[in-house]
Amino acid sequence: LVGSEMCIRDRNKSNILDIIRDIKDGKMVIIIDDESRENEGDLVCAAELVTPEIVNFMASKGKGLICLPMSTSLCQKYNLQMMTNNNRATNKTAFTVSIEAAEGISTGISAADRSHTIKTAVNKNSKSSDIVQPGHVFPLKAMKGGVLSRAGHTEAACDLAKLAGLQSAGVICEIMNDDGTMARRDDLLKFGQKNNIKLGTIADLIDYRLSMDATVESVLDKDVENEFGEFKLNVWRDKIRDEYHFSLMKGNLKSVESPLVRVQTQSILQDTLGIDELGKNWSIRSSLKRIANEGTGLFVLINHKDAKSYWLNKLEEKEIEPKSNRRVIGVGSQILRAFDLKKISVLGTPTKYNAVSGFNIEITGFVNE
């Protein structure tokens, strides 16, 4: 067991189908994320079925920030702009501007008012004019592909609601202890038992979704040869963005307990022009050479487009926003799962890869020489 699965024994968590049934029945559930990520548990319910009682429970018992995860299409319906165009938060939580129902509320902050705002926002018959900005409800924009693209509570809430046959929108609230600290592991189990709320994990939701609708598929595989020897080439299609990614496998991955793996995007400076990029030690060629020398390993190249000004700012040594690796991890992890990899040694410097263990992949170490 890895990641959040290490925190929760099977007897203490519910089957994902039971979680979905409770969501469909208008109940709250507790969803725990990856231990290497926020390592928190959120109360989650379907936005369509929220009630003033649920909002009050979240506010008084959960104690965290009550948010409204929504699909991209719902955010577009109300023309919700992002709270900031320079999101530097660790987990890149996609807050939009806050909202309020245009009618039917008083101050906007009461449990009844917030419940009304949420239900107005997800009502299929609502018009864009039915929601105003700012307000007391905080929408979060979910990534396309849900937890298969980003293993966060935002995407989990939307996925669970959709799997329950409802609008792709949920209501979430972090669970805090009475002393103001974040509830972890045992705290969450006790909270769920005390309040008769089922508990599930994002890892289980990812497993369930992968069994039904993985967003990445192999469309070609063949033996190829390059300057570093013979490899097995796979071409992968991203069904959400209609983009193609590539993997090169050396040897038999099953013959090694923890094979060497490198997942990266292409660097124009380093891989095309041969200019070393600051902070990046492994080019495509050096990675393939290292894997070839190892005799067994996997190299994955993710097709990732950089902002137009990224490389110019890089060359001018200007301060730039770090690349977001959310989609790279989501797509890359699906590809690793397709090879049935459970344990890997990562070629590169030690880095915190959020939510990899949500895909049931354990990083056993890093190789950087």
Residue ranges and their predicted role:
Residues 1-8:
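Short, small-residue-biased leader/transition segments that mark boundaries at the very start
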